[in-house]
Amino acid sequence: MAKLGTPLSPSATRVLLLGSGELGKEVAIELQRLGVEVIAADRYADAPAMQVAHRSHVIDMLDAMALRALIAQEQPHLVVPEIEAIHTETLVQLEQEQGLRVIPTARAARLTMDREGIRRLAAETLGLPTSPYRFVDTEAEYRAAVAAIGLPCVVKPVMSSSGKGQSTLRSEAEIAPAWEYAQTGGRAGAGRCIVEGFIDFDYEITLLTVRHAGGTSFCAPIGHLQKDGDYRESWQPQPMSSAALARAEEISRAITDDLGGWGLFGVELFVKGDEVWFSEVSPRPHDTGLVTLVSQELSEFALHARAILGLPIPVIRQSGPSASCALLAHGEGVPYFNNVAAALQVPDTAVRLFGKPSVHGHRRVGVTLARAETIDEARAIARDAAEAIGVELRP
């Protein structure tokens, strides 16, 4: 896309975001900076990206007819999936029927909408190293898979994210409740799950991999801390051996080359010494990549915007040791934030409040960011800033 138009005019370059959370919000901001007309869609009103878009729509993106109608109405030049819960078969059909441009491709969106498609591609088609795994549909199959793989192991719904429905099993007593949670906690309700063997890794990373007009570029590796399958902290760069980094880039290039298209991919990997295992990939900016808002000259969101528009990415510069820490809210209500000033008193500290309209249960509502001389210092500053901010929920 060599030419860009003017928003809200006949020449406008229109981008439709399918999913309007905090990551989509940052993508929308970067697209706005490049003069793109942004349309944001999600299943609920006033989602974060809707607050910075030119127009927004509330639809069930798993409804094929509603999705077709929205695309017909808006006539976007690019469709950018920002979440998994989309009727991706419709995108595949529209790509074939009308030449609809889906980022990175409709096939990539379909394969990565659940864990089965991408795991089978990585392990069985490409031969990439992964943990042992089995897919199960019933409790009997699940129990047989746990027995075959052994404890400890992990069970996840094939369609979920942010740790929803996910459990780590370390004892026989956890087998039954983990199945129940997998059937009730996933985004798509009860259904198929993956049981994975537990890899005794030293650390896990996200390798942000950008496919763009000039080739493939890699960001510095991002280390992260997960709790209950959900991101809590991330930092960049994660120290690792040159051999492990080379292997991580090799695996990331293999999976993203197969998925194709342009855009940023978040490739999750386990590392032990010089050994690297593939875990998952998202064909879009990654939550652990929020740290790049301060750690890189071009954040993951700016890189994604440039890549999908066909703009050059000559270099990715790092700004030094940096960290992020998630702000969490628990309960019911509208979030209010106290003591933001206290969090910002330390130099090289930043805060992003996502603007989520409400909280129901457990939700990430913001992030603190910090730069320092070392990773440990940056992590401590980001944590202290997050602890300083009190998140209050009101009716």
Curated annotation (Swiss-Prot):
PROSITE patterns: ATP_GRASP (PS50975)
Highest taxon of the lineage: Bacteria
Binding site for Mg(2+): E268, E280
Residue numbers binding ATP: R115, K156, S161, S162, G163, K164, G165, Q166, E196, G197, F198, I199, E204
Example of a GO cellular component annotation carried by this entry: cytosol
Species per Swiss-Prot/TrEMBL record: Stenotrophomonas maltophilia (strain K279a)
Domain ATP-grasp per the UniProt entry, residue ranges: 120-309
GO biological process: 'de novo' IMP biosynthetic process
Assigned protein family: Belongs to the PurK/PurT family.
UniProt KW Magnesium keyword: yes
InterPro entries (UniProt xref): ATP-grasp, ATP-grasp_carboxylate-amine, ATP_grasp_subdomain_1, PreATP-grasp_dom_sf, PurT, PurT/PurK_preATP-grasp, PurT_C, Rudment_hybrid_motif
GO molecular function: ATP binding; magnesium ion binding; phosphoribosylglycinamide formyltransferase 2 activity; phosphoribosylglycinamide formyltransferase activity
NCBIfam families tied to this protein: PRK09288.1, purT
Pathway assigned in UniProt: Purine metabolism; IMP biosynthesis via de novo pathway; N(2)-formyl-N(1)-(5-phospho-D-ribosyl)glycinamide from N(1)-(5-phospho-D-ribosyl)glycinamide (formate route): step 1/1
A Pfam family it matches: PurT_C
Role of this protein: Involved in the de novo purine biosynthesis. Catalyzes the transfer of formate to 5-phospho-ribosyl-glycinamide (GAR), producing 5-phospho-ribosyl-N-formylglycinamide (FGAR). Formate is provided by PurU via hydrolysis of 10-formyl-tetrahydrofolate.
HAMAP family associated with the record: PurT
Protein name: Formate-dependent phosphoribosylglycinamide formyltransferase
Gene3D superfamilies to which the protein is assigned, alphabetical: 3.40.50.20, ATP-grasp fold, A domain (3.30.1490.20), ATP-grasp fold, B domain (3.30.470.20)
Subunit structure: Homodimer.
Catalytic activity: N(1)-(5-phospho-beta-D-ribosyl)glycinamide + formate + ATP = N(2)-formyl-N(1)-(5-phospho-beta-D-ribosyl)glycinamide + ADP + phosphate + H(+)
Catalytic activity, EC: 6.3.1.21
